[in-house]
């Protein structure tokens, strides 16, 4: 089926909360970006990103979270 004849599927609202940094050329498809999170350049976000997280990739995955007890960013395995 040609692209022009394929149906458009609604994936849900895009929500960008307070203090979010979004890099260049990012696509956000039906997802919520949590407070004070960072989305790396060229990422494709298809799932919700928690507060105080750094995500990157295609599809985007959380790669770091902020630890308030240690006051530092912790890498996510």
Residue ranges of predicted features:
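Flexible, glycine/small-residue-enriched loop-and-beta-strand segment within the central core
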Residues: 1-33, 58, 66-67, 73
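Beta-rich strand-turn-strand
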Residues: 25-38, 43-47
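Short-chain dehydrogenase/reductase
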Residues: 21, 38, 54-56
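Long hydrophobic alpha-helical segments typical of transmembrane helices together
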Residues: 45-46, 54, 59-77
């Amino acid at each position: 089926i040609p692209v022009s004849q394929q149906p458009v599927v609604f994936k849900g609202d895009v929500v960008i909360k307070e203090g979010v940094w979004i890099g260049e050329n990012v696509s956000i498809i039906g997802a919520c970006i949590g407070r004070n999170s960072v989305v790396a350049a060229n990422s494709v976000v298809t799932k919700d990103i928690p507060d105080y997280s750094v995500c990157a990739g295609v599809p985007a995955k959380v790669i770091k979270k902020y630890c308030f007890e240690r006051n530092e960013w912790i890498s996510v395995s």
